Swiss-Prot record:
Keyword Transmembrane set for record: no
PROSITE patterns: UREASE_1, UREASE_2, UREASE_3
Binding site for Ni(2+) 2: 222, 251, 277
GO BP annotations, alphabetical order: urea catabolic process
Chain sites annotated for binding substrate: 224
UniProt source species: Verminephrobacter eiseniae (strain EF01-2)
Biased composition regions of type Low complexity, renumbered to the chain: 393-411
GO MF annotations, alphabetized: nickel cation binding; urease activity
Modification N6-carboxylysine occurs at: 222
Gene name in the database record: ureC
Pathway field: Nitrogen metabolism; urea degradation; CO(2) and NH(3) from urea (urease route): step 1/1
Protein known as: Urease subunit alpha
Positions of the Urease domain: 134-590
């Protein structure tokens, strides 16, 4: 039987089982766990498009029509990186969703084909490229619409949060307050080739004004200290969420005016809640908001300005906080408020808590102390830093926060030749976990059959920093594209340009607007004149930290109020600030 060298095979068809590759300029090494293209029985039946290649009439392209099962688009030889596993496979898309993951080809001439390529099938060649689900940023201040282009260009395809533009309230808090503002933002969402969902304002001691926001289409409610995150407001807001199957996002009381972290935990009363700013400097009860990392009903997340901890982190934060929260440096109390939130000890602990899987999600806090285009980049910088400082990460024992794991990957994860488990843990922080937390995992968050085809392609050398292609609902929405007047697509200047999926009526068919079940049932789509596909959030109120994939660790947390030292299960958490990081200047010379 004819053979081919492993390197030559990888260069032609992409890596296969046992092959390893480096993620950009990080120290993270990925290993392929399984190869679904081998369902044909052996190597040699791979599909590939091009002159003299196999996807031709009568070869790997069948005669099947769409009605006979041919897919709309096939992604060939993709290296799928997902929290559930790292596998090589072909991906078939139909009707804007992932229809199949497996072996593509012509069932009349090939064995094991579960994705039919027909005359009506488009091909996206993924040989040598990494494929991930589109990222989810669940902490968006909708301050300006230009954020959306930057987020999409970074690989984020779903943005959840609140705001109305550069209003003073939105500059500080992620709330779209009231039915009128919610309606306007849902109408604006029709213009953008990303999935959007809006949080109403949850700060109220009576339920009426909160119910009307959910009825208007808000996917949940945001409690922010700048509006008064009192125990009464927290409890009332959660009462409404329980009644409407929506999420509550909490930015708790930094000043401890209306209570301490213990009072907030008591007000939550064991109900599920998204704890935004469960972190070292972003806000919430000072200095011990990290206590909630050990609570089973709190779903903790970080924003990216403190991630990872570097020697520049502390210096930039005071001025940044003063601007974002409408503070005055000439007022001593305002300055003290700002300085109380910025603690190097808790910032350092935040990195380690992410590596332990104790903080479950990453987000941006866009233009309100966070950078909307750097969620993915900073997640992988943190993973790299933690490998440098803490070494190889072993998977936890069964039942200790391991989350999902493909059968193929269970053995590979324990091999010190690769960082597969750490990769899955960090990937889950901005894909499947925010999807689960906000009730949208039935639509997005992973590469899985039936889900919306929000897919990002990466060349390994640019992984995490500059995607090659971004698909929304099965259609290319954004791409790194060369000079449109050139004779081929690659000449300089190459930069991100909107593609056909980002224009006209295609936006409405390829992107989702998330709304409440109450809003969908009330017919807000027709009433507001919305064009986008609407999808209701669901299954939220039973979600607990145990449901956070690869990030469900519940340590006993201790934070010293005087020294700010952080301990998890008795272990002191501290690390040095980074002085140099990957995915940085090397990628942004031009």
């Amino acid at each position: 039987m004819a053979t081919i060298g492993r390197r030559a095979y990888a260069e032609m068809f992409g890596p296969t089982v046992g092959d390893r590759l480096r993620l950009a300029d990080t120290g993270l090494i990925l290993e392929v766990e399984a190869d679904y293209t081998l369902r044909a029985g052996s190597y040699g039946e791979e599909v590939k498009f091009g002159g003299g290649k196999t996807i031709r009439d009568g070869m790997a392209q069948a005669q099947h029509s769409r009605a006979q099962g041919a897919v709309d688009t096939v992604l060939t030889n993709a290296l799928i990186m997902d929290a559930a596993g790292i596998v090589k496979a072909d991906i078939g898309l139909r009707d804007g969703r992932i229809a199949a993951i497996g072996k593509a080809g012509n069932p009349d001439t090939q064995a094991g084909v579960d994705i039919i390529i027909g005359p009506g099938t488009e091909v996206i060649s993924c040989e040598g490229q990494i494929v991930t689900a589109g990222g989810i940023d669940s902490h968006i201040h909708f301050i300006c619409p230009q954020q959306i282009e930057h987020a999409l260009a970074s690989g984020v395809t779903t943005m959840l949060g609140g705001g109305t533009g550069p209003a003073t309230g939105t500059l500080a808090t992620t709330c779209t307050p009231g039915p009128w503002n919610i309606e306007r933002m849902l109408q604006a969402a029709d213009a953008f080739a990303v999935n959007l969902g809006f949080l109403g304002k949850g700060n109220a001691s009576l339920p009426g004004a909160l119910h009307e926001q959910i009825d208007a289409g808000a996917i949940g409610l945001k409690l922010h200290e700048d509006w008064g995150s009192t125990p009464a407001a927290i409890s009332n807001c959660l009462d409404v969420a329980e009644a409407t199957d929506t999420q509550v996002a909490l930015h708790s009381d930094t000043l401890n005016e209306s209570g301490f972290v213990e009072n907030t935990i008591a007000a939550v009363g064991g109900r599920g809640i998204c704890a935004f700013h469960t972190e070292g400097a972003g806000g919430g009860h000072a200095p011990d908001i990290l206590r909630v990392v050990g609570e089973a009903n709190f779903l903790p997340s970080s924003t990216n300005p403190t991630m990872p901890y570097t020697h520049n982190t502390l210096d930039e934060h005071v001025d940044m906080l003063m601007v974002c929260h409408h503070l005055d440096a000439s007022i001593a109390e305002d300055l003290a408020f700002a300085e109380s939130r910025i603690r190097k000890e808790t910032i350092a602990a935040e990195d380690i808590l992410h590596d332990l899987g104790a903080i479950s999600m990453m987000s941006s806090d866009s233009q309100a102390m966070g950078r909307v285009g750097e969620v993915i980049l900073r997640t992988w910088q943190t993973a790299h830093k933690m490998k440098q400082q803490r070494g190889w990460l072993s998977p936890p024992a069964a039942g200790q926060g391991a989350g999902l794991s493909s059968a193929a990957g269970q053995g590979v994860d324990h091999d010190t030749r690769n960082d597969n488990f750490r990769i899955k843990r960090y990937l889950a922080k901005y894909t499947i976990n925010p999807a689960i937390a906000h009730g949208i995992s039935h639509e997005v968050g992973s590469i899985a059959v039936g889900k919306w085809a929000d897919i990002v392609l990466w060349k390994p050398a640019f992984f995490g920093v500059k995607p090659a292609l971004i698909l929304k609902g099965g259609q290319i929405a954004l791409a790194a594209m060369g000079d449109p007047n050139a004779s081929i697509p690659t000449p300089q200047p190459v930069h991100y340009r909107p593609m056909f999926g980002a224009f006209g009526g295609a936006i409405a068919k390829t992107s989702l607007t998330f709304v409440s079940q109450a809003g969908l049932q009330a017919g807000i789509g027709q009433r507001y004149g919305l064009r986008k596909t609407l999808s209701a959030v669901r299954g939220i109120r039973g979600i607990r930290k145990r449901d956070m994939v690869h990030n469900s660790y519940l340590p006993q947390m201790e934070i010293d109020a005087q020294t700010y030292m952080v301990r998890a299960d008795g272990q002191w958490l501290s690390c040095e600030p980074a002085t140099e990081l990957p995915l940085a200047q090397r990628y942004f010379l031009f």
